């Protein structure tokens, strides 16, 4: 288990791991998670969240990504099974969780994500009256430079 916090107008990298991760939103005024299993994201769903919401990652092959489109910092508690929920029937364990897909890992780097992902985010930010702060990582971002270290997102 761990707690993660991220500023307004930022989001985490898309990733996957073993099933059974549960996220409980501890603070924040709005945001969402995207969840999909198909490479073309044809089955992608947007799960809006608010304070007290729970997001459940349903399966091993499920990519997911978390976005803070609200007006306050967002914090969530990630709960996983005893094996940290990182072991995968596809092989490997937690060492793949923070490794790029290009290196055989389970994480999609910002520069490799589909433009659609960021466009959805900017649309949601606009609806909440917030500004995107991902310009340091996303070349087509129409917002501003915010965090410059991935650890700050």
PLM feature segments, named:
Residues 1, 19-20, 30, 63, ...:
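Extracellular structured ligand-interaction cores
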Residues 16, 22-51, 62:
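A short beta-strand-loop-beta hairpin characteristic of the jelly-roll/cupin
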Residues 8, 29-30, 62, 81-84:
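Short, glycine-/Ser/Thr-/acidic-enriched flexible segments
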